[in-house]
From Swiss-Prot:
Superkingdom of source: Viruses
PANTHER family, alphabetized: LYSOZYME, PTHR38107
Active site: E42 (proton donor/acceptor), C51 (proton donor/acceptor)
GO cellular component: host cell plasma membrane; membrane
This protein's name: SAR-endolysin
Documented effect of changing C44S: No effect on enzymatic activity
Post-translational modification: All the periplasmic cyteines of the inactive, membrane-associated endolysin are involved in disulfide bond. In the active soluble form, disulfide bonds are isomerized and only the catalytic cysteine remains free.
S-S bridge residues: C13-C44, C44-C51
Annotated TM spans: 7-24
Role noted for this protein: Signal-arrest-release (SAR) endolysin with lysozyme activity that degrades host peptidoglycans and participates with the pinholin and spanin proteins in the sequential events which lead to programmed host cell lysis releasing the mature viral particles. Once the pinholin has permeabilized the host cell membrane, the SAR-endolysin is released into the periplasm where it breaks down the peptidoglycan layer.
Coiled coil: none
Amino acid sequence: MKGKTAAGGGAICAIAVMITIVMGNGNVRTNQAGLELIGNAEGCRRDPYMCPAGVWTDGIGNTHGVTPGVRKTDQQIAADWEKNILIAERCINQHFRGKDMPDNAFSAMTSAAFNMGCNSLRTYYSKARGMRVETSIHKWAQKGEWVNMCNHLPDFVNSNGVPLRGLKIRREKERQLCLTGLVNE
């Protein structure tokens, strides 16, 4: 763990400190490798900022209860992050058979849900059908085909229809973590 911090304006915070606090609370299932992946991909900022999507954000990818101009403490950032991770974990448990998943697969899928949101991981809009349809990753998870599920994480690299380098890198890291410890089933 490199203890990476966010770049850019405003005060930064140490991901390693946030991981220690969250893991010490004992409430999340996501393992240390998963927390490192999420934390390093999201970065950590004490001061609120407007993200590229036009949403006020602070801490580690937190968009809930953000007050522009109000700097957060380590404890506040860790509490927000833990709540957001628990939301992502609930998605994986409820919709992707998370309780049956190996820990690394669960942690990687939690990272994807944290980043994309539950609905975007489960379904996408098909122009051809004129409606939202089930994603391949969701289909494989429902079958308990963890290797196939993991190998579909790189399907999610676009933002507004444009592939982003940062998402390609993150999804490949998620895929690698997801496959760690799995055997061909």
